[in-house]
């Protein structure tokens, strides 16, 4: 015996409402980084006024030159140098 069309519609709408409410609960619990947290994090880990040398910032990703022709991994269309 099948369900009537009106019961299927009501159950479908109830499911949509439930999923919409469940989605807003998850979205509301997401935490964001605030400006004070960003300001506090802009120093060295062991930064101390008594030891100012520990407060120097270091470059995150120092520049490294890519692979050259002599290493054999450079895209060169001509013959390899000997």
Curated annotation (Swiss-Prot):
Expressed in leaves and flowers. InterPro entries: RALF. One of its GO terms (cellular component) is apoplast. Disulfide bonds join 47-55, 67-73. Induction: Slightly induced by abscisic acid (ABA) and accumulates during senescence. This is Protein RALF-like 8. Its main location: secreted. Residues 1-28 form the signal peptide. It is found in: Secreted. GO terms for molecular function: hormone activity. It comes from Arabidopsis thaliana. GO terms for biological process: calcium-mediated signaling; cell-cell signaling; positive regulation of cytosolic calcium ion concentration; regulation of root meristem growth. Keywords: Disulfide bond, Hormone, Secreted, Signal. Cell signaling peptide that may regulate plant stress, growth, and development. Mediates a rapid alkalinization of extracellular space by mediating a transient increase in the cytoplasmic Ca(2+) concentration leading to a calcium-dependent signaling events through a cell surface receptor and a concomitant activation of some intracellular mitogen-activated protein kinases. Belongs to the plant rapid alkalinization factor (RALF) family.
């Amino acid at each position: 015996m099948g369900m009537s069309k009106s019961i299927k519609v009501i159950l479908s709408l109830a499911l949509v409402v439930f999923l919409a409410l469940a989605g807003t609960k998850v979205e509301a619990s997401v935490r964001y980084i605030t400006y004070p947290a960003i300001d506090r994090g802009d120093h060295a880990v062991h930064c101390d006024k008594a030891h100012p040398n520990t407060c120097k910032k270091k470059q995150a990703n120092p520049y490294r030159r890519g692979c050259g022709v002599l290493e054999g991994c450079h895209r060169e269309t001509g013959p390899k140098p000997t």
